[in-house]
Amino acid sequence: MDVHDLSEEAKRGVIHTSEESLDDLCVDFRGRPCRPSKHGGTRAALFVLGFQAFEMMAIAAVGNNLITYVFNEMHFPLSKSANLVTNFIGTVFLLSLLGGFLSDSYLGSFRTMLVFGVIEISGFILLSVQAHLPELRPPECNMKSTTIHCVEANGYKAATLYTALCLVALGSGCLKPNIISHGANQFQRKDLRKLSSFFNAAYFAFSMGQLIALTLLVWVQTHSGMDVGFGVSAAVMAAGMISLVAGTSFYRNKPPSGSIFTPIAQVFVAAITKRKQICPSNPNMVHQPSTDLVRVKPLLHSNKFRFLDKACIKTQGKAMESPWRLCTIEQVHQVKILLSVIPIFACTIIFNTILAQLQTFSVQQGSSMNTHITKTFQIPPASLQAIPYIILIFFVPLYETFFVPLARKLTGNDSGISPLQRIGTGLFLATFSMVAAALVEKKRRESFLEQNVMLSIFWIAPQFLIFGLSEMFTAVGLVEFFYKQSSQSMQSFLTAMTYCSYSFGFYLSSVLVSTVNRVTSSNGSGTKEGWLGDNDLNKDRLDHFYWLLASLSFINFFNYLFWSRWYSCDPSATHHSAEVNSLEALENGEIKDSTTEKPRI
């Protein structure tokens, strides 16, 4: 009988694995079992949210104005400066996978944050020292001058810059997934409403950090110097560490569970080894670890990647088999979930490529516009990125207070709309951000070249505003989606995939810039300037590049619709809701004996 027969048999039984619930696993900072009256809850989460706001404030002040520093102070060409910034931010997000791995496997989220918080502070201090000491920078020079050749930073000067950025990237990257997972761990997984509210609150803290960074801290960098600005980032990060440590006695901590990659590898090896076997209809032939635990977690059968089901088939006549030849149902399900979310993850890469433009070319776009509000007051171009966060400071509470309860009544979903619907809404809106950017850049360029008039910097506000709204949907939806689909042993790692999407988006931006320059150069070899090949945006065709991104984003939205439907059609997509219902039934005494239940994979 084949795998389909096994799934049909499973449909007639209630299915459980032997994994403990997260509530049973959590301990305090001394390793003792948590007490609901003392540990976790909103009080503990507030300390984590404070750390989130301070850390975002520190890294955003550096990342969002970094292109100005490397262009004006390090004298890198504009395209190289843009690529350095996108590569830096991409590396920050890519290293989130390392942070998630170390947390889930060895350190736990709290210890991981303590270690890498110190590393990030050291990077900010090194940046401040370089910006302060003239001997660590090339001679001052006006990069916009057409008659002077500015000396680009090289040797030990460039090495100092790269070392500082690597420290910041390593620290911030390894922190990001753990902030979210550690904060979410302060609530019980069955409490979907509080979890959803936490994710919205985390984005609110993120927005507050961004807003202060893009206004106050960027103003400090502009008027007091980059050395003072980087020093302030170090001080702000230190304040965040104080907030994190202050909540130590209140935290629920999930202990590390050992290497998360070994069980995944075991599933593939076992499935390949037993590739010629046929799945039996008798569920007793499927391996489950023996356990005396009362709390169990349900798994729904997935018809996707059915070849992996063979990894948990018992071989007749063998009492004991190697874990590389026989895996548990939970292991197989965990691998299926990991493979199933990859297409959703991939569909958000273009979205983050658009974000990269708002932190690089759009800042330079603002530098080519009239930044004066009054005769004496100017807006730093990097502060333009604060516009969406000013709006979101008001939108996020309104979304949580009014939209979610209304949508909850209409849809029956505890989050108002499902995470997949929330992601799709954001992807749809992101296209219009690039449409607005292209239209404004075309008008800005024509006004300067034909009339010698500089448009007001407020003309580029719509592209930031629209993308800010789209990010409220996609970013929060993606974090909530990955966290809810993760197994208890992979919470930080799977949450890190959210940030890995940012990483790939920024790396793709660098590839697109280089490719577009080469393809659009007059002879195709890159020896003559392409759309983005000059240091002067009035000579470049940034508007064409924005139209290209708008087209890619529009196509990507329909690609996402296909994959989200593919994912939602599988019964295992309701895994988290089933888990919650089962745990509630256990607590109410509705399930008396889980040892007689049949497994489902």
UniProtKB/Swiss-Prot annotation:
Q: Which gene encodes it?
A: NPF4.4
Q: What is this protein called?
A: Protein NRT1/ PTR FAMILY 4.4
Q: Which family does it belong to?
A: Belongs to the major facilitator superfamily. Proton-dependent oligopeptide transporter (POT/PTR) (TC 2.A.17) family.
Q: In which tissues is it expressed?
A: Expressed in shoots, roots and stems.
Localization recorded for this chain is: Membrane
Q: Which Pfam families match?
A: PTR2
* Membrane topology, record value: Multi-pass membrane protein
Q: Name one GO molecular function term.
A: transmembrane transporter activity
